[in-house]
């Protein structure tokens, strides 16, 4: 040892380095002092001049010194020292550095007092800790004296430590052992012991959990990834948390509950007072684990639905005893409840063959038989059951553990399989047995027909609605204005209507009770019933929204802090419906409080931001500042502002516009036209001046529509621009706007749309026209659009939000962002532009700004068919009856507005104002009166006919089926981009087929299977998923890009299955979505998956307008999206029952464009009746000039 130490006395280089380092430190200190003295002198001479220089120099000097200090005082060092003490599991180095002997790892047995060792330290704050004893540099002699050890310690004090940089990194691991205050974690760097008292964590770890450790690590260039030793573990998290996963209780043990084949929860993690039983449905926060057969562990649950011990499987088993419509009936007991462990009991069941042929029971399979308490006694061999006869099956139950379990078994017949379950409950006492029996009886009553989960959710919604507690309001997004020009009424839902909707057990009973209580529902809609009917329909829609919002409620939840906000994690928030938006609220309630108590209070949290998987809230300061991670019960509420605006409009519109506007029965001409223009050929003149068209590519029908609107000869009646798919509705609307602004100086126009995307499109088209200056028009947006960053950058400088505060009643706080977005504009800044574009309900913000009558002169709607009538009335109510004009542009034969309440939809709420008007006499088709305008009165309606979207062989389908065979194709079937693309893509079909060169519609017949998962009411068809995927691959091989393809299917489950197929195979995914997602869009190639293959399910679709079959509007949208090619995948035997689908299939058959399974007989019998040529679908054109 002394040989090693002596080196430090004979090393002149090392002494020289130490001297030079000391001189450097002294020089730096002296330089700093000299600088300070110089600054003091200059400051005394000229204090004003030196001020700025002084602060800059001091800052530079301080920065340089701090950098020097940091580099010299790294928290991780490698040092050399002498072991001065060893006592069991602890030791001391250099008399003052304590360490645990386990940090020596492999060399622990070689450690002795007097050894010179190299060790790694990590300093946090004032404390230095030995992380690892790396090696023994010099072993000690047995007769080494204490004096010699002290001398070696003194000599080593001059040894310069090696400094290492540190970094925070994540290390993944698996907990192998859980002790009282520590865990052992297996990592790729070896076993690591983590003291739980010294780290941050968000869950209680246990054996088998997969975890992520946030560690400070040593950066060592000796390793490839530069990671040396793990110095300190600071945080412990699960590798992943899946929040809000729906799980069903499958087994209940003494210490744990099984929530699925791979999921469990420890009973210690259950909320206090929660007792789970078989069949209970819970929302669980799951983490990854590796424990026995389980891969997921629930760390927190929220009970969602109590089933008291019965499951849908056991209910199915008991229901099977009725035998109604079943091939095999299973009768007998389906549960066994006892208080004895290791008891054996035989149970017998009877199997009845309900078919008219003999069945063979080949075997009985007990699922998971190694753990099951159920075993088969007889029959052990195959056995035949003749038609109408029965056999006995005997099982033995052997109770093996306390708790509840579902034992599954399968009856394997020669033609089918019958799955059944048996419930086994083992209790501790006979009293518990009696309680379990009561629970099972209650469960069967609860799951009886007529009390499904949807009806139970309504009962819960009623409880929430009836809970009246004091609410302490949260912090508003913007300051609530005390003075506004017009205050909207509250328009609360009547108590009696709420009681009917939320307490009726069956829908038919609900409808009957509503009609009895509100007798005007049985009368036709008229000016007398108008306000009452639509107010009721709005209330029904609000009630349904309230019920749907209960899906967000939680029995237990906690918040996390994020700056000035409290945040709440919500899994899959972006995909959930109804959506949460800024301004919605939630209320937090103490879960232990008595809801009936007068002292119970709740705090309101207002949503200020909505992110991908969490929301940011602000509460009253008394809650926000003191919150410390406690759990609360949460109830969510939507903002009623939109409903209130619609109620206000409905209550005023009758008085503002009158019966002639709402229920037109005749066309009355004005004394003078709105604008005295006239048409000569395709040119428009005002007086003797020719008016230039902004868009020179408009066809003659579009120009005529603009002319009719400008003249505005009809008195107080809406003008309808009827535009089939691809006919240029928006293009015509833009031209109308520009002509109104140029030729009517007093015009101030509102443009209303059903969605933000369509409002953005109108804004972009106006910008692209370059006909108006910035400031002539404005795009009114909501705060929700701003906060979610949903405004396209190219229109940002044209957008603004409004402030409803009365002018002069509050400080003007309008702000303009760097992008040009104007925020919080009061009436003096907004509402005075020539054109204001927004969604219908956002335009309703102007209702409270107090504009005088006649302030707005025109309201134009784009996609008016997708607006409900109350939404349409919101901007119209700001007009006056005289000298105003309303234009409705849309297609009533495409999808309607989305209405969540089925009852309201059935009562006409989903019918748009546009669609209702077309049933009135002035808008009806009369070819005899108006032969030159497709049979419509040009004073009130123009139907656009030229189709710019699709090849004739695609357009002809929806033209014939939905538009009286009147549409005129503009695209050439011989010389157009689409026709050349179609010609290139013919390679994806069978070469021997004699398909007409210009034919772009194809049908692929598949006898598939529609399936439905237990956790979703939506449907999917795996055979169609496969064929659609293979066709997409074939198109890619033909050099088609993903943005040229669209895949449409009516069911969300099929959408998910298709997306999973592309993601799982790492193939570029085209746009895949429902019909609603494709309305207003187009693609070169459209693939349609119809999904359904069951007649029984088709009957249900017809009732609820699901799928494509017998829902003409959905079919119309689906088949009108393609430009060059459309391929439909479906079951022709089922689709052909519908007349529209049969015509489409026949069209493909006659053009040799049908592939796949055999055709149904009804199509074969009829195919000779359908002409092969396309002329039956496309109007003949006399000259090519008509297309120009």
Swiss-Prot record:
Gene3D superfamilies: 2.40.30.270, P-loop containing nucleotide triphosphate hydrolases (3.40.50.300). One of its GO terms (molecular function) is ATP hydrolysis activity. Abundant in oocytes and syncytial blastoderm. Expressed at low level throughout development, including somatic tissues. First apparent early in oogenesis, in the cytoplasm of stem cells and mitotically dividing cystoblasts. In regions 2a and 2b of the germarium, it is most concentrated in the center of the germline cysts, where the pro-oocyte is located. In stage 1 and early stage 2 egg chambers, it accumulates at the anterior of the oocyte, near the ring canals. It also extends through the ring canals forming a branched structure that links the early oocyte with adjacent nurse cells. It is found in: Cytoplasm. It catalyses: ATP + H2O = ADP + phosphate + H(+). Keywords: ATP-binding, Cytoplasm, Developmental protein, Helicase, Hydrolase, Nucleotide-binding, RNA-mediated gene silencing. ATP binds at residues 723-730. It holds the Pfam family MOV-10_beta-barrel. GO terms for biological process: dorsal appendage formation; embryonic axis specification; germarium-derived egg chamber formation; long-term memory; microtubule organizing center organization; negative regulation of DNA damage checkpoint; nuclear-transcribed mRNA catabolic process, nonsense-mediated decay; oogenesis. The keyword Repeat does not apply. Its EC number is 3.6.4.13. Forms a complex with piwi and fs(1)Yb; this interaction is required for proper piRNA loading and nuclear localization of piwi. The interaction of piwi and fs(1)Yb is likely to occur via armi. Probable RNA helicase required for axial polarization of the oocyte during early and mid oogenesis. Plays a central role in RNA interference (RNAi) process, a process that mediates mRNA destruction of translational repression. Required for the assembly of the RISC complex, a complex required for target RNA destruction or repression. May be required in the RISC assembly to unwind miRNAs, in the production of single-stranded miRNA from the double-stranded miRNA, a key step in RISC formation. Belongs to the DNA2/NAM7 helicase family. SDE3 subfamily. This is Probable RNA helicase armi. It comes from Drosophila melanogaster. The gene is armi.
